[in-house]
Amino acid sequence: MKVKLFPIPARGSGTAEIESLPSYIHRAAHQHGIFVGELIRFAGRQVRRDSSYQGRLENTPTYLQNHEILRSNKLSDYLIDVFEHLTGQTLSGTYASVLSKAFTRSSHEIVHGFRWCPECIDEMLALGEEPYFKLSWHFRALSVCPIHRGELLQACDHCGCKQTSYRRIKPLNVCQDCGKPISYRKASGGSKNAIPTWMHTGRDVLQLVSDLQRYGYSSLPENGLVTSVSQLFDHYWRLDKEDKFYELLSRDKLLSVAHCGHSLCLNDARKLSFRLGISLYDLISGNAANTTPLLGID
């Protein structure tokens, strides 16, 4: 089949700067000169008529909220399949499927709507690049830009518009309501208003995004987090130091993972990896026992 949509690549592929799926869809709608809803409906009609499309078919809601398609679920998987098929581009890293596959569900890990760093948007424009919204900006854990140290915005500082309108008639760097640049910030993100580097509490999540782009989601084994915690438990058990093991996280949570095969929410996994001195990727890939400095396991 010939490509039915412009072959628009996702921005920042292979890096921690990867574009989010909602950003890609909004950007593609603007480049095609149609509203977001029209683009999604058109894409759905095309794959239904295309005998070469082997993916699953889904009925899309009238309106999609960003946080609903940033996890791995039937709807987000469907949109990825459809847009990859129609554009010939790879989009698998544009949503946070790791939240559904490696961690237990929590409604607080992804913010609603879009967020952005005005200084990053301004730099994209200065470099002649098309502005976009990064996947990492959707994580609640990351509230400050790690590059410019300014707080991420969730609404236009001119008029308060949140940029989620399906009437995508302007590029992503322009407010969809007032038409002014969203790269504007009332209080400068630099100098005295910059957030100290030690307050960048979301760096571990940013590193996870980077690691998943580098190694691929397919590199994560099934129940990798369970493997890590079980091996840690066995190590402390052999040394008769279970009390030290339970200092890493609550006893009930750790045993539910080691003995019952349950997972952890992202926030609990962050606490555990921090106390072990390892990355989130090592924890959920089953490598905690081999990388934890405190253990010295050969």
Where are these regions (language model features)?
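Basic, alpha-helical nucleic-acid-binding regions used in initiation and control of genome expression
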Residues: 1-298
